[in-house]
Regions:
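TRAFAC-class small GTPase G-domain
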Residues: 2-190
Length: 190
């Protein structure tokens, strides 16, 4: 049994396929750092506008996507939340393939959370030497327990030749969006 509609047959025109979601740019952004530095909380706050303090660590990697409009361009940000646990560390170089940018997070209330910065910057630059990397100090809302001052974060960012330094609060949302916008602007300027 055949079904057809005369009007459709007569009015058949050339159809131009355009994907429902077309972007001017798509950027892969890595979130790296020790366990407990709020990488997942940062991704969730930016992409989903939720704060969910969780003890659950990503098993290897979690993915988030957010579309932003900047400088008249529609930009898709693919955010890769890389598990910081020791048992997944061997996967980090594999996940970093094709990355356009990265954020290395540390906890300003725990100076030990900076232990991996040298290793992480080396892994990222091994894959792409001019990759923009931002150093992010998390948990800025807990000022009374601060172990690392802002000036120290800036020094570390300069020492490792990182693009910039920022402090965020995933609980209040302070500087969360600005950090991603700053990184996206760096990518657009390249």
């Amino acid at each position: 049994m055949k079904f057809w509609n005369k009007r459709i047959v007569r009015k058949r025109r050339k159809v131009i396929f355009r994907p429902p979601y077309s972007y001017d740019y798509t950027f892969k952004i890595m979130l790296l750092g020790e366990p407990g530095v709020e990488k997942t909380a940062l991704a969730q706050k930016f992409c989903l506008d939720i704060f969910s303090p969780s003890e659950k660590l990503p098993v290897g990697v979690d993915f988030y996507v957010k579309t932003v409009e900047l400088q008249g361009k529609k930009i898709k940000l693919q955010i890769w939340d890389i598990g910081g646990d020791e048992r997944f560390r061997f996967l980090t170089p594999i996940y970093c393939n094709g990355a356009n940018a990265a954020m290395i997070l540390f906890d300003i209330t725990n100076s030990q959370s900076l232990n991996q910065i040298s290793e992480l910057t080396n892994i990222l630059r091994e894959k792409k030497s001019d990759i923009p990397i931002i150093l992010i100090g998390s948990k800025m809302e807990i000022k009374e327990f601060r172990e690392l001052q802002r000036e120290r974060g800036i020094e570390i960012a300069k020492k490792y030749n990182l693009s910039s330094y920022s402090e965020i609060s995933t609980k209040t949302g302070q500087n969360v969006e600005n950090s991603f916008i700053d990184l996206t602007e760096i990518l657009l300027s390249q």
